[in-house]
Amino acid sequence: MLRLPSRIVFPFGYRISVRQISDTDMDRRDPNADGIWDDDAKTIYLRKRLPVTRRRYILAHELGHAWLDWQHRHLDNGKAKT
């Protein structure tokens, strides 16, 4: 079985942490969410109790949010060119 990564690195050294947290910790952030992208902390939080297939799906979804933030910082602000 493939494990979920604890860190992902986008181009230009944009590092993202992936944390699998308890229901209590997730509920403090957002009781209605199973996954959260925190742009300030550059961290994706996933609800640990969910089946791994569901966590993978949520990770992919949250990576989409992270990618858009990366794009805004590096492409839209002129740090990189397509």
Cite the ranges covered by each PLM segment:
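Catalytic zinc-binding patch centered on the HExxH motif and its immediate surroundings
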Residues: 1-11, 17-43, 52
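Post-HEXXH active-site segment of zinc metalloproteases
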Residues: 30-33, 43, 52-57, 68-82
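Residue-level recognition of the GNAT/N-acetyltransferase active site
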Residues: 47
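Histidine-centered divalent metal-coordination motifs
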Residues: 61, 65
